[in-house]
């Protein structure tokens, strides 16, 4: 099949359009579409195209990445233009800026790949998936990191056996498995190969799927016997109105009424639900929230910004109002966001970006980090490891807190991105974290996707996006550690890097 297509695919009139087409199809492999089976086919077709014209490997990989990331993250334009009011003259080129940077990583992967002089089966079937995974890992770490769009996320769905690798080695192991499946499909479908060479990748594919399925059925963590009801508040506050002074009282009143309508054990408000600095609020406001929750038998967590303890900055926090007493503001337990969004929550290049911030009239764009390991917040009978906004896109950073927690919780405000796919892509990342860490993940968001996710990554309840609502459901506390929690990503990634180096060393010695 592949050999018959090759003569058409390598023609310049088809090669570049096909490359763009395959890349543009990648968003359909992620949430909200969940066509997980499509990603290995796309990746395999992409690799086969590059095989046909290896001279253009680096430029082809860059174009593929640029197209894929632009179509996946089109919602950047929504945030810049539709919400922040930046004119298209600036919003359009800035929308391409992040994909243009991210595309450097696929290009780097194939630049390194071209350096290997190896038999095709090893170069395609082993080395390439390793290099792809390592460069994806680098993309998540370098310059604060941005791991959205890693091909492994396409498999985070109940139907994909490859999702079973998440609790074993995290999302990057799922990425490695997805890349392996894609290239082994190419090797298995090669009509010119001898039957023996075609049989090996078929066996490897079967073994890979079986291993993933088996891991998916394995319970690495266990319930601790505790059960709780949770209420996740979704205020549906328009981002263009959120920080206006005339909307502060209506917003506070809305959430106060929502808190009063639920008798759940644990009640969680979204990120920056209260659009005022905590220390600037009249103390009786928080006291009333705490009293309202206490009267209903609830523990209450609220997303709010607050000044740092030294008073020299501010931080994005979730405060635990359980047992709150008026006149004791300094004694409030809280979690403060540690992994900040560059250009959104702090200014990495203030001399360049300050004029843009003024044009967009962005509030609170210079947050401070909350610090390294922070204690889980005790709410009723659950120890909750909170993360805020896109922090749940970084699995390794959540491990330490998760070890001491029975429940994971994310507080977010995705109103910046309107009705785009951003909220669903973010939800899929939370599904991955639940699987990696073997615990329930609850998500309280302003506009969506508010949800309850099981330790297997299944969405067991979800609120209708872009509506004012309260999502209620049941969760269990979980304890124990997945294999991923014991080692993180770094150790096994160093192992496959060493394997790639060993392969190169062996074959170079054979040449000499």
UniProtKB/Swiss-Prot annotation:
Its job: Catalyzes the phospholipid dependent N-acylation of the N-terminal cysteine of apolipoprotein, the last step in lipoprotein maturation.
Enzyme Commission number(s) from the entry: 2.3.1.269
NCBIfam families recorded: lnt
Protein's UniProt keywords contain Membrane: yes
Record-stated family: Belongs to the CN hydrolase family. Apolipoprotein N-acyltransferase subfamily.
HAMAP family in the record: Lnt (MF_01148)
Subcellular location: Cell inner membrane
Pathway where this protein functions: Protein modification; lipoprotein biosynthesis (N-acyl transfer)
Residue ranges crossing the lipid bilayer per the database entry: 5-25, 56-76, 92-112, 118-138, 168-188, 195-215, 487-507
InterPro entries in alphabetical order: Apolipo_AcylTrfase (IPR004563), C-N_Hydrolase (IPR003010), C-N_Hydrolase_sf (IPR036526), LNT_N (IPR045378)
Protein name: Apolipoprotein N-acyltransferase
Keywords annotated in UniProt: Acyltransferase, Cell inner membrane, Cell membrane, Membrane, Transferase, Transmembrane, Transmembrane helix
